[in-house]
Regions:
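Exposed alpha-helical structural elements
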Residues: 15, 19, 27-31, 48, ...
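An acidic intrinsically disordered interaction segment
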Residues: 23, 28-45, 128, 147-151
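Generic, low-specificity signal for short hydrophobic/alpha-helical stretches with a mild N-terminal bias
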Residues: 14, 35, 47, 54, ...
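A long, hydrophobic alpha-helical segment
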Residues: 36-74
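Generic structural signal for short, flexible, solvent-exposed coil/loop and linker residues
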Residues: 17-21, 39, 51, 66, ...
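Internal, Lys/Arg-enriched amphipathic helical interaction segments that engage polyanionic partners
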Residues: 1-36
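Amphipathic, oligomerization/interface secondary-structure segments
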Residues: 63-187
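A generic structural signal for ordered alpha-helices
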Residues: 10, 27, 31, 43, ...
Length: 187
C-alpha cells in the first residue's frame, strides 16, 4: 500500500500513518516481542523490561512504553557490540573515523574516540555493515542522527529522541507514533 508514496509530506502524512498502523497490528508487535525473547544477542535480563514496554504499548500507555525503550536502547547497542566482539570482529578506529565524517561533515573528527560510547559503537556497525550483519545503513543513520540527537531543534520532534526524553527535554512523546517508532527502533 505504501508503493505510491515516495516521501512523507504534510499532505500524505495521515494516509501513511493509517497504512503503517494497519500493518503494525497487535499480532505484529507480539511477533517482534517473540523475536526479542528468542534473541541470543540481548542480555536475558533485558527481556522482562522489553515485555513491560510492549504491555504498556498494548494498554496505550505510550509515555511509559517510550520511556522504557529509550532507556534500553543504549544497552541493546552495547549488547550487539559485545556480541560482535565475542565473534572476533575487530574495532577499526579508521573505519569509525570515516563513518563519523560521513555523519558529521560539518564537524572535525575528535582526536579521542571513546570505544564504550554507544554512538561510537553504532559507527562501528556502519563500518561493518558491508558484511550484512544485523543492521542496514539507513537504520543506523536514523538511530545516530535522529534518535540519539542532542540538537536543540529536535526538542519536540515527532521522533522519540532518546537523549531528549531521558533528560526531560522532549515532552511530546506520549503518542502512538512515538511508541511505535521506539519499538521499531529496538527491533
Amino acid at each position: 500500500e505504501l508503493v505510491p508514496y515516495t516521501s512523507i509530506s504534510e499532505e500524505n502524512k495521515d494516509e501513511i500513518s493509517t497504512i503503517v498502523y494497519k500493518f503494525c497490528t497487535a499480532e505484529f508487535i507480539d511477533g517482534l516481542l517473540m523475536d526479542w525473547n528468542n534473541s541470543t544477542v540481548m542480555d536475558r535480563k533485558r527481556i522482562p523490561i522489553l515485555q513491560e514496554a510492549i504491555s504498556l504499548y498494548n494498554s496505550e500507555l505510550y509515555y511509559g512504553c517510550v520511556s522504557i525503550l529509550a532507556c534500553q536502547l543504549n544497552g541493546i547497542i552495547t549488547d550487539i557490540y559485545n556480541m560482535q566482539r565475542a565473534y572476533g570482529k575487530e574495532f577499526d578506529f579508521e573505519d569509525v573515523k570515516m563513518a563519523y565524517q560521513s555523519f558529521n561533515p560539518q564537524k572535525k573528527v575528535p582526536t579521542i574516540i571513546k570505544k564504550d560510547s554507544e554512538r561510537t559503537q553504532l559507527l562501528w556497525f556502519i563500518s561493518d555493515a558491508e558484511e550484512g550483519l544485523m543492521y542496514w545503513i539507513k537504520s543506523i543513520e536514523y538511530i545516530y542522527n535522529i534518535i540519539l540527537t542532542s540538537k536543540d531543534s529536535m526538542n519536540q520532534s515527532s521522533h522519540p529522541c532518546r537523549n531528549k526524553i531521558c533528560h526531560g527535554i522532549q515532552l511530546n512523546f506520549g503518542t502512538r507514533e512515538h511508541a511505535l517508532k521506539s519499538i521499531l527502533t529496538i527491533d
